[in-house]
């Protein structure tokens, strides 16, 4: 089955190369071709989903391919998926056709280049999640910048050049130091860029590990984005075309949180424990700051962009809790955010296509004119604010309870302050719904608007279905993520053990104090017995 | 005694020299005015010389004054590749302006033969001769169009500063000879002579620093790069830089690897400072440039800084292998990219009615506005070159930067690595500005666009292929570079 992952990974790229040959003038051909390629990619990726094993004997990384690439520099082509990477790959391939379909009418200029950029982007995104070689990961991670830069800069709205240059320079600047850290790792793990081997044999002093973690963390924190390095996000989101916003919110931001989960924490667990309080605090600040900023926005896209800052704060908070619940919730919230915020950007894009404005004040009382759009908007909003029964609830509940139960210093404060973000979220999102869809229809231009078209229904139905399925039956998703979560937890526990051997006065830091939720217990991976339990 | 094997090792040099002489003779005797064969012959000679270099036997030549090895072969291939591409650019550019002559190609071939010899030199005097062979030809090339102010000014500046650098080099070589009684690199490695040797080596390095355009010996670069005819600028950026770095690496390694050498570490430290200055100053000065040709000139200073990082790393025990191969990979990647970029600049250059008209506006970034609409292929190529110069994957520039910084980390030069990556962010900003202009700004009104000459398009296409191939599958080049580094 290993070949399947490679096919899923490179199919969009080859689709993009083939699209180069199609005639420029035939916009419809380009649209259909891109849709076809992304649909085939999605159906093939379902094969990954159904063949992934989560049992006790299952390998950590599945569908692995390991080939030499630049052997004389020690760089290999090594790809494979664990549960978390699989979920994010599925999110990417599922959003692919949705994004392409949503851009059907919006993009009128340079249609050919637009869809080539989208397909190129899809390969780079899947590659980022599938890579198991540090340089290969970096290559995909950086290769995303170019098509995204063009998407915002060429097809964006008025202030696009400023936004896209800011986006590029911010993320490029943040990630170059990670390259130096990767090179340092190479010379201290026996000379390999291979992630699995590096994780095993990395030998660095704690003082150096703190710097290396910082280099990785800065790169990922900008991508997440965490407060206070989030300022590129509102601009990029606001100026990007709908498809760009959806990809940015749906997948690109996850590359930051995934980076923490896959690279920064497992490679430098002790340094991660060192920085945990700081990152957790920044996450909480991000939650509240993002929510407050959302509340005062007059521009719909900007509002949703700031709500992303708030939601990604939850993801980071759950990760820093370093409990089974927190980590699981964090992974789940990555998916939720991709679905619901992606959905919100799609809906905002539909309104904008009809009225050519993003200002909230230009709308009002639309519920009568466009009942279907309004209904779906409300559903997605409820998911975004975490109403029980929707996917958002599962993620936020796991994160907050995981934080509450965690052995951070003052976990109650983190959880309580984080929980205010849920309330603020309800306030700004519901007030958005109210100002756009309810109240009096005062602007005459809003009187005759088309409701959901068939194409748009095809775009939105998968989102709504996912919101319901992931809200009511989260288990398949949680089970898929669980082995990876348990492994990370075991790794963190052995780091804690190591620290406490050196300094017995240290208290326990990983896992929960009391009996945990049934969701994530007992450990699914007996192959890696947690050292903390052994010592008791 | 010169044996057949020696001749075989020197074959690239001989081919280039013979090609140049043939070109000059044919220009005299064949006066039909049809000159298409000349560029074809020059490309053919370049390819043949590169092929000869690949199969050249490894041996010591001229009683140890030169050596043919993997390193010299690699440099020869890069120089010949730069020659072939810039000849293609030159053909179209010169023909449009009606100034195509055999001498142009002859001078380029002579210059390349000097570069090839420079890649082989393991003796200060041979190095000096090679530098002069190369430089005299390039001075003449810079002034090639003869009419017009800028080429003359550029050539004059280049000549004066170049003579000064040569004089410094020669004076240094004489001091080294006085101190050690030999000009062989192997003799330098034995050391002795104390302060006199140090002074001599310092002067030699100053001479070379001028040639590679490292800050603070860079002041000539922007004016010369801007003023010289664009195909010549491409040739200078690709070939002259490669050859100068080849001799710098060989000489510097001899200085630091010897047992009794004075202050090998200090020399490394001095080069490290030059590297930092070049990266910072080159990038900072490139930032405000609106003239693309001048921006590329400043960026070439910054790239000299990155290359110096590799050289410094090669001077340490841990980073020796990684450093040498990184410099070679970087030279190959930079040559392909920069020739391509200048080829695009040449393609966009207006053919002025009279050469006395100042063409500075021809290189303004406004010329690139809307290029993605009017000429999508050219714009795409330029975007690839800009991303490669900025070091964004998956291009050659990324692999090159990766190997340079890998060498720096191997040599535990963390400061150089961190300054290197941070300054490369500045680079991303000004390279992107060209992409912004091409893809995100409307074209200037009333801008008629001439189609690019065929040979220029061919050169651009070849360069794009090279840049992307090096970015995606660099193993063949990286393997060759590593083999070359192991033998050096």
Regions found by a protein language model. Name each.
Chain A
Residues 1-11, 81-92, 134-147, 209-222, ...:
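Structural signature of hydrophobic alpha-helical transmembrane segments
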Residues 1-4, 21-116, 192-200, 508-533:
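Transmembrane helix-loop-helix hairpins at membrane boundaries of multipass inner-membrane proteins
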Residues 16-21, 46, 97-101, 123-127, ...:
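Alpha-helical transmembrane segments of multipass membrane proteins
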């Amino acid at each position: 089955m290993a070949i399947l992952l490679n096919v899923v990974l490179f199919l969009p790229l080859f689709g993009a190369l083939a699209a180069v040959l199609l005639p420029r003038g035939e916009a419809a051909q380009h649209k259909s071709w891109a849709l076809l390629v992304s649909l085939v990619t999605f159906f093939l990726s379902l094969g990954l989903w159904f063949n992934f094993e989560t049992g006790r004997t299952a390998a950590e990384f599945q569908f692995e391919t390991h080939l030499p690439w630049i052997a004389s520099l020690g760089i290999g082509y090594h790809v494979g998926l664990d549960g978390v990477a699989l979920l994010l790959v599925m999110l990417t391939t599922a959003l692919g056709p949705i994004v392409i379909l949503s851009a059907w009418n919006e993009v009128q200029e340079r249609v050919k280049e637009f869809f080539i950029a989208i397909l190129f982007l899809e390969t780079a995104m899947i590659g980022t999640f599938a890579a198991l070689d540090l340089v290969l990961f970096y290559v995909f991670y950086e290769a995303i910048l170019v098509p995204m830069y063009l998407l915002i800069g060429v097809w964006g709205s008025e202030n696009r050049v400023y936004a896209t240059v800011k986006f590029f320079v911010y993320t490029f600047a943040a990630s170059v130091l990670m390259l130096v850290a990767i090179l340092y790792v190479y010379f201290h793990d026996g000379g390999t860029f291979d992630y699995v081997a590096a994780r095993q044999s990395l030998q660095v002093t704690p003082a150096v590990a703190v710097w290396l973690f910082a280099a990785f963390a800065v790169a990922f924190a900008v991508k997440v984005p965490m407060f206070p390095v989030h300022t590129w996000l509102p601009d990029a989101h606001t100026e990007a075309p709908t498809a760009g916003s959806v990809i940015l919110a749906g997948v690109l931001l996850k590359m930051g949180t995934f980076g923490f989960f896959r690279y920064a924490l497992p490679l430098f667990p002790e340094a991660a424990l060192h920085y945990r309080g700081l990152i957790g605090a920044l996450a909480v600040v991000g939650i509240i700051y993002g929510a407050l900023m959302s509340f005062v926005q007059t521009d719909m896209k900007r509002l949703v962009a700031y709500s992303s800052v708030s939601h990604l704060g939850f993801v980071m908070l759950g990760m820093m809790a370093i409990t089974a619940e927190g980590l699981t919730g964090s992974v789940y919230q990555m998916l939720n955010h991709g679905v619901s915020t992606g959905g919100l950007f799609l809906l905002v894009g539909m309104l904008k296509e009809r009225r050519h404005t993003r200002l909230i004040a230009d709308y009002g009382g639309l519920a009568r004119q466009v009942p279907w759009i309004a209904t779906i908007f409300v559903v997605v909003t409820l998911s975004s604010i975490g109403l029980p029964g929707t996917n958002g609830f599962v993620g936020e509940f796991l994160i907050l309870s995981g934080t509450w139960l965690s052995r951070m210093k003052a976990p109650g404060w983190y959880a309580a302050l984080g929980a205010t973000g849920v309330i603020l979220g309800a306030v700004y999102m519901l007030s958005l719904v109210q100002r756009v869809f309810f109240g009096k229809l005062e602007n005459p231009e809003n009187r005759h608007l088309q409701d959901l078209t068939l194409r748009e229904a095809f775009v939105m139905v998968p989102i709504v279905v996912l919101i319901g399925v992931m809200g009511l039956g989260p288990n398949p998703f949680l089970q898929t993520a669980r082995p990876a979560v348990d492994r990370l937890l075991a790794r963190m526990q052995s780091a804690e053990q190591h620290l406490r051997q050196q300094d017995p006065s240290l208290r326990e830091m990983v896992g929960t104090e009391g009996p945990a939720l049934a969701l994530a217990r007992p450990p699914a991976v007996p192959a890696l017995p947690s050292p903390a339990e052994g010592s008791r | 005694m010169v044996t057949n094997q020696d001749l075989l090792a020197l074959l690239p040099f001989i081919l280039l020299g013979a090609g140049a002489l043939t070109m000059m003779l044919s220009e005299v005797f064949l006066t039909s005015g049809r000159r298409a064969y000349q560029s074809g012959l020059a490309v053919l000679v370049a390819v043949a010389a590169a092929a000869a270099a690949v199969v050249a036997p490894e041996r010591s030549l001229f009683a140890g004054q030169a050596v043919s090895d993997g390193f010299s072969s690699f440099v020869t291939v890069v120089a010949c590749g730069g020659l072939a591409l810039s000849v293609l650019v030159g053909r179209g550019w010169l023909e449009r302006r009606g100034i195509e002559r055999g001498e142009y190609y002859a001078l380029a071939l002579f210059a390349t033969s000097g570069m090839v010899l420079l890649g082989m030199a393991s003796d200060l005097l041979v190095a000096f001769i090679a530098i002069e062979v190369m430089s005299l030809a390039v001075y003449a090339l810079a002034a090639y169009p003869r009419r017009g102010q800028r080429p003359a000014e550029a050539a004059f500046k280049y000549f004066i500063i170049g003579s000064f650098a040569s004089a410094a080099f020669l004076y240094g070589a004489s001091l080294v000879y006085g101190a050690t009684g030999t000009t062989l690199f192997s003799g330098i490695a034995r050391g002795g002579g104390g302060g006199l040797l140090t002074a001599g080596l310092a002067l030699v390095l100053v001479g070379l620093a001028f040639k590679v355009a490292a800050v603070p010996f860079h002041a000539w670069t922007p004016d010369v790069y801007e003023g010289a005819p664009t195909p010549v600028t491409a040739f200078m950026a690709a070939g002259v830089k490669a050859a100068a770095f080849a001799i710098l690496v060989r000489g510097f390694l001899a200085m630091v690897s010897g047992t009794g050498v004075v202050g090998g570490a200090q020399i490394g430290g001095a080069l490290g400072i030059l590297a930092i200055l070049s990266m910072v100053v080159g990038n900072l000065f490139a930032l405000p440039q609106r003239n693309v040709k001048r921006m590329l000139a400043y960026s070439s200073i910054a790239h000299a800084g990155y290359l110096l990082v590799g050289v410094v790393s090669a001077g340490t025990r841990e980073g020796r292998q990684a450093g040498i191969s990184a410099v070679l990979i970087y030279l190959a990647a930079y040559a392909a990219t920069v020739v391509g970029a200048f080829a695009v600049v040449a393609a966009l250059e207006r053919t002025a009615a009279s050469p006395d008209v100042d063409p500075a506006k021809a290189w303004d970034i406004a010329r690139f506005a809307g290029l993605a609409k009017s000429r999508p292929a050219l714009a795409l190529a330029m975007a690839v070159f800009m991303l490669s110069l900025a070091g964004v994957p998956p291009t050659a520039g990324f692999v090159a930067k990766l190997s340079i910084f890998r060498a720096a980390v191997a040599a535990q030069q963390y400061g150089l690595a961190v300054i290197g990556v941070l300054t490369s962010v500045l680079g991303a900003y000004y390279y992107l500005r060209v992409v912004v202009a091409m893809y995100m700004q409307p074209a200037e009104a009333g801008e008629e666009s001439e189609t690019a000459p065929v040979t220029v398009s061919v050169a651009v296409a070849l360069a794009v292929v090279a840049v992307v191939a090096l970015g995606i599958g660099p193993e063949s080049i990286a393997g060759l570079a590593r083999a070359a580094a192991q033998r050096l």
